[in-house]
Amino acid sequence: MTENGGTAAGPVISVRDLSTGYGGNPVVHDLSFDVKAGEVLCLLGPNGAGKTTTMLALAGELPLLTGEVEFAGVGGKAPLFKRARNGLSYVTEERSVFKAMTLRDNLRVGGVDPQEVIELFPELEQRMGTRGGLLSGGEQQMLTLGRALARKPRLLLADELSLGLAPLVVDRLLQAVRRSADEDGTAVIMVEQHAHKALRYTDHAIVIRRGRVGLDLTGEDARKRISEVEHAYLTSVDGNGASTPS
């Protein structure tokens, strides 16, 4: 067993034939993959393809309709708090920031040493006394991601880190994710719409189309076949040009 929950060859998280959705109605169908320690998997696709729905199921926030999820010995029906105890950190689309607290107190209330986050994002050092509500969107995301990574999770789920942020900030965030995988052995599953940037940091890419696997590629193959990956987005809508429910 490695420090981050898998064997030397085995996965940290294993997903088999996962179907999940809302009110008993499947949105995601028959999804299967493994993620090993130190590996970054990127789930790609347009709005409504089922990416966030998948993440909610992996975190234990949505029920599995069929299939299995195994993470650190915890099955797919375990809620988020039990998974967190086993080393899961989940960065959602909504940045989890206490707006009335300083950046420093936002970290301390989460049990994180601010210095560990400064090591990841040195630009935050001069902002430690600033209230969360006065931080820029990029600074808030650095706070949220830094807090998650400072806990040295076995598994990081990161949903749309790049949402609404400048390209340079997105690079800083994705570099921190890659560093955590490489140096700490964190297994990472991240959701992104913007393939070009995300694929620079990815070992494995899955394009979800209408709730199903459209493409399943190594990171290297996905980078070589970027036009095909992007074409998969364009064919992930219904006949009226609208995405399926997320």
Predicted region positions:
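ABC ATPase NBD coupling module
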Residues: 63, 75-95, 126-129, 222-229
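ABC ATPase C-loop
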Residues: 148-149
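Conserved ABC ATPase signature
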Residues: 131-135, 139
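C-terminal boundary and immediately downstream tail of ABC-type ATPase nucleotide-binding domains
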Residues: 2, 119, 204-216, 223-246
